[in-house]
A protein has these predicted regions:
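Positively charged n-region of N-terminal signal peptides that target proteins for export
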Residues: 1-4
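Bacterial N-terminal signal peptides
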Residues: 6-14
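Cyclophilin-like peptidyl-prolyl cis-trans isomerases
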Residues: 17-248
Length: 248
């Protein structure tokens, strides 16, 4: 079965055909002004797959722009306001009006070059990492060295510790409030250090954050954006046209 629809992006992204090689792995051909890009949607991320198909079939992406293009990073689309935007207009705030529960399946799916992922609001307002209903991005990224990957692993480890620290602090907020009322900065610092020590120990008991060898190989050969792994839902990938600008 083949379906046709169009979406345009400031490159200009216009999606054109849907052709499934089987029912569980739909494939979409995205026509742009600089070349065609074909993506497949992963069967395991069912909510994101079904949502993308629904929006594409009803023409949501017809004539839409790639409103965010960052060299060596990614290109992003899905703002319906871009269909009628004048030159120079600020874009990125438009969406479907709903979100999709996160389907983060790292390390099965990750931000290698060509990955298709859902945009979302930041953790400060979106701690459950729910995805945008309509906005998505395609990963360009860059090839990384072993040293770069080591730094990313170290930063990821620290973020895990910090996130757990925040959870543990939240569970001890009454105790912390008592110390704050006393205005004893020494005790407050000691309390925070104690909680951070617990967080670090718990994270280390699970093992250090390390990229699996196949993932490491991809980031050192084709490239990607590893610092976004386990943060955003990756729900597909480019299967043809990865060398179309700006992916070349």
């Amino acid at each position: 079965m083949i379906k046709t629809f169009v979406f345009t992006c400031s490159l200009i992204l216009s999606v054109v055909s849907f052709a499934g090689n089987n029912d569980s792995v739909p494939v979409y051909n995205i026509k742009t002004t600089v070349g065609d890009i074909t993506v497949k949607l992963y069967p395991e991320t069912t909510k994101h797959r079904d949502n993308f198909i629904k929006l594409a079939d009803k023409g949501y992406y017809d004539g839409i722009l790639f409103h965010r293009v960052i060299n060596n990073f990614m290109i992003q689309a899905g703002d319906p306001k871009s269909k009628t935007a004048v030159k120079g207009a600020a874009l990125g705030s438009g969406d479907t009006g709903y979100t999709i529960p996160a389907e983060i399946l790292y390390p099965q799916y990750y931000h290698k070059k060509g990955a298709l992922a859902a945009a979302r609001q930041g953790d400060d307002v979106n701690p459950k990492r729910a995805s945008s209903g309509g906005q998505f991005y395609l990963v360009k990224g860059k090839v990384l060295t072993e040293g770069m990957l080591f730094s990313i692993e170290r930063d990821k480890q620290r973020k895990l510790e910090k996130d757990l620290f925040q959870e543990l602090i939240a569970a001890q907020k009454e105790e912390l409030k008592k110390l704050q009322l006393k205005k004893d900065q020494t005790q407050i610092a000691a309390f925070n250090d104690s909680i951070m020590g617990i967080a670090r120990q718990k994270i280390r008991e699970k093992g250090e954050y390390k990229l699996a060898l196949p993932i490491r190989k991809d980031y050192k050969t084709i490239g990607g954006i590893p610092h976004l792994d386990n943060e955003y839902t990756v729900f597909g990938e480019i299967v043809e046209g990865i060398n179309a600008h700006p992916f070349s």
